[in-house]
């Protein structure tokens, strides 16, 4: 029961922080460098998600589960304290009603529709890993492949964010849609783990190209005075349709 409760609180915290965080990134970065800014965020976030479990694995024999959980709370506490050093630009209260979709741009509404449809096709990374196991990869091999996927994602996210700034955020998002379709077609076609691994690493390219560019492109479609609310609505719609 306690594990379920804390997991629920963890997901609640993620829901509360995502929209304001993305809005802060959008306000803190020049418009011509949004791809790099979000790419850097995705890179560091993924790198942390890769190194964290590895460190936990090393520390588990020394500290036990409770010790690892206590130690894991320290980075979150440090991040919370660092937020007090962030200074937001003062602005008058938003004149728009909360989540007034009709007041948002047609471009945003179209992007919300496209993203919602895309969310219906999204599935958990676990399905790809199960496919690797089905094709004969060992449990250890699957774990190593997923670690390499995350590492490649982390290494590529920032440079591909910069590329998105140069070629256009919308084009990079469209490229991401195409890569995702190609990856899932590839996993359906693959008859050996070798080919599936190739498509898993192509999936890392998709993640690095799409995740940052998608958030950056969204930030260009929402009004300054309703940025956090519009981003929050986007994540709500996509999150519900993912279920």
Where would I find each of the regions flagged by the language model?
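Transmembrane alpha-helix termini and helix-breaking/packing motifs in multi-pass membrane transporters
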Residues: 51-69, 243
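Helix-to-loop junctions at the C-terminal end of transmembrane segments
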Residues: 60, 156-168
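Symmetry-related core transmembrane helices of the 12-TM Major Facilitator Superfamily/SLC fold
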Residues: 67-84
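Structural signature of the two symmetry-related core transmembrane helices
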Residues: 73, 171-186
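Helix-loop junctions at membrane interfaces in 12-TM secondary transporters
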Residues: 1-6, 188-199
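Cytoplasmic helix-loop-helix junction between adjacent transmembrane helices
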Residues: 6-47
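Juxtamembrane intracellular "pre-TM" segments in multi-pass secondary transporters
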Residues: 88-115
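Helix-loop boundary and gating motifs at the non-cytosolic
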Residues: 108-145
């Amino acid at each position: 029961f306690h594990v379920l409760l804390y997991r629920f609180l963890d997901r609640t915290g993620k829901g509360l922080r995502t929209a304001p965080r993305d809005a802060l990134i959008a306000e803190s970065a020049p418009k011509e460098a949004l791809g790099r800014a979000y790419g850097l965020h995705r890179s560091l976030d993924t790198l942390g998600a890769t190194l964290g479990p590895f460190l936990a694995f090393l520390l588990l024999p020394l500290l036990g589960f409770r010790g690892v959980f206590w130690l894991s709370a320290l980075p979150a506490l440090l991040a919370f304290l660092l937020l007090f050093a962030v200074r937001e630009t003062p602005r008058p209260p938003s004149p728009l009603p909360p989540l007034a979709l009709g007041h948002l741009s047609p471009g945003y509404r179209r992007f919300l529709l496209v993203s919602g449809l895309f969310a219906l096709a999204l599935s958990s990374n676990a399905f790809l890993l199960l496919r690797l196991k089905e094709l004969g990869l060992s449990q250890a091999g699957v774990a190593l492949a997923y670690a390499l996927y995350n590492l490649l994602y982390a290494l590529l996210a920032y440079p591909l964010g910069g590329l998105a700034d140069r070629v256009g955020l919308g084009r990079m998002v469209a490229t991401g849609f195409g890569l995702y379709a190609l990856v899932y077609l590839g996993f359906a076609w693959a008859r050996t783990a070798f080919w599936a691994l190739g498509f898993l690493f192509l999936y890392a390219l998709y993640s690095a190209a799409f995740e940052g560019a998608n958030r950056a492109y969204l930030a260009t479609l929402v009004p300054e005075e309703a940025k956090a609310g519009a981003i929050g609505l986007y994540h709500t719609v996509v999150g519900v349709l993912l279920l």
